[in-house]
A protein has these predicted regions:
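A non-catalytic, helix-rich entry segment at domain boundaries
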Residues: 40-107
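Cysteine-cluster motifs in flexible loop/terminal segments that predominantly coordinate metals
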Residues: 12-19, 211-235
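Nuclease catalytic cores
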Residues: 6-51, 84, 106
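Short, intrinsically disordered, charge-biased short linear motifs at domain edges
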Residues: 1-4, 204-220
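A residue-level signal for conserved active-site and pocket-lining positions in enzyme catalytic cores
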Residues: 14, 38, 42, 124, ...
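Short helix-capping/linker segments at secondary-structure and domain boundaries
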Residues: 26-27, 46-54, 96-98, 165-171, ...
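Mg2+/Mn2+-dependent nuclease catalytic core
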Residues: 103-201
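Hydrophobic (often cysteine-bearing) scaffold residues that line and stabilize catalytic clefts
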Residues: 34, 38, 80, 84, ...
């Protein structure tokens, strides 16, 4: 079986949602947030440094952000534009102060677990300026406090590390989480127990899809789900 990481996380979110998107081809666009635009510009920042070996100016990033914003302007009010600029400046100032050295931005990966092929893209990888070791960087943009318990268990981090660590020459077990809005930071790591958990999760998802287990996950997220009017749980 072949799965993208998006399919995997959609199934975890709600098996019924997976069924609508990938079996019944009911594809609904997820509402775009201003943080999505900021994140695109941050990835551009990483790619620019990797390609040109120098830091782009804040004006370059602001121009990139403005072009993205104008393309989807009807989706946002004017206050969101200002909010995005604030986040972008925060990121730029922090990255320059940290002398952030990116190794990759959204590196593609293919991971084999038994007869299951998982395809996806990792979070950006940066080089720690003190230890000179690799670590994943996960940027957050909301105003909420970092949920350390959630971050310590986050499956995406385990998946990234497991996929990257297939390379015998490099190892990453550390993930730096940076909240750009409130400047909070948290370091988490992964070990063999985390890798066993993500492998087991992938196998369970594969079995669920093969056996057509597409029940709705009724819960607090249902009210904001774009598929709620299609879902039998709401009929």
């Amino acid at each position: 079986m072949e799965l993208t990481e998006q399919q995997m996380f959609d199934y975890i979110y709600c098996p019924a949602l997976y069924d609508f998107k990938y079996n019944k081809n009911v594809v609904l666009e997820k509402p775009k947030k201003i943080s999505d635009l900021v994140n695109q510009v941050c990835n551009y920042f990483f790619m620019y440094i990797i390609e040109f070996k120098k830091i782009p100016s804040l004006a370059m990033l602001s121009n990139k952000y403005e072009k993205l914003y104008l393309k989807d302007k009807e989706l946002f009010d004017d206050s969101k534009y200002t909010s995005g600029l604030f986040l972008l400046r925060n990121f730029y100032n922090w990255a320059c102060q940290e002398k952030l050295t990116p190794f990759s931005s959204n590196m593609p990966f293919a991971l084999t677990i038994d007869d299951i092929e998982i395809y996806g893209y990792t979070n950006p990888i940066v080089i720690n300026k003190n230890s000179k070791t690799f670590e994943f960087l996960f940027l957050k943009y909301n105003n909420r406090l970092l949920d350390t318990n959630d971050l310590d268990k986050k499956l995406k981090f385990s998946l990234d590390c497991l996929a990257f660590n297939q390379n015998p020459n490099y190892k990453i077990n550390v993930i730096k989480v940076k909240n750009i809005r409130n400047n909070k930071e948290y370091i988490t790591s992964r070990n063999n127990n985390d890798y066993k958990r993500i492998k087991s999760t992938i196998k369970n998802i594969s079995n669920g899809i093969k056996n057509k287990v597409f029940y709705p996950s009724e819960g607090i997220k249902c009210k904001d789900c774009p598929y709620k009017y299609y879902c039998k749980a709401w009929n």
